Amino acid sequence: PTDDPTHGKQQLALFHGYYEQHQYFPLMISEPTTKHMFLGWLRPGTVHAALGAEDDVLRVVLPLRVEQPDMAIHLRGDCGFGLPKMYQVCEDHQLTYTFGLATNNRLKAQTTDLVTQAAQRYEETGEKQRLFTHFEYQADSWDRPRRVIAKAEHQDAGTNLRFVVTNLPVTSDEQAEQRYDDYVQRGESEQRFDELKNGLELGRLSCHRFLANFWRLLLHVAAYNLLNAFRDAEETPAELRHAQPAKWRSKLFKVAAKIVTSTRRVLLELPTHWPHWPLFEAMCQRVLAFIPYTTPRPAIP
């Protein structure tokens, strides 16, 4: 989830004590390879971080299973999503997962030796230490034991102890480290949220009605995915390839223009000496390449 501050009297924009602001609390699901947003779901400002998450996962997964039944799907999420009902959904639908797990006294007791060993190695070498282990663990709310990976990191600031729960196979401490390092790559999804919020103004959910703002959120997600598709295409000009959304806006869209309409066409008139015209022309040609025409394609004057 990501917090989305509000500054008016929108429906269901409520005060969240942790963030200390009035907000919406949208849930986003992204895919790391294509960097696309698979789902954006607007929620009231005070809901639990995982509210409805298992249903949203199924909204994404079930259509994929119909199209590609044998596709391997792996979910990553922080400890806010690490709930028994989420584990059950993943296991029922043959999904692998790695979720953060909140630290508690039982977990600390099982990793006392690991923490001590990390501290001793740091004292001996003066270098940061990262040690890993794995074990079976069952919380009181779980129906059965599950595999937990523990990381003990020791440096000048002290010991940093973290846990994740996974249903991936783990047969050694080295493999536990690999699984954990893969889990922390979920932080890359935060970059997607930043691009949406800062580059495409996701926070502009300023309609009064909740459903209207929900629609605006979906438009933001669709715009992001469209931009993302062009941004990573080989035919896209090098200056824009992999560029931030803010650069796309400043180079292609922030320009004075005149729109002339007639019964036969809509004409967009741009300044004669616009410095970014070559980029705009190249992207127009790229867009036209997507359009199936039965008649000759229109020329760009």
Task: Label every model-predicted segment.
Residues 96-198, 283-301:
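An anionic, glycine-rich sequence signature occurring as long contiguous blocks
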Residues 42-66:
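Active-site beta-loop-alpha junctions of metal-dependent nucleic acid enzymes
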Residues 1-3, 35, 73-82, 97, ...:
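Short, conserved catalytic/metal-binding motifs centered on acidic residues
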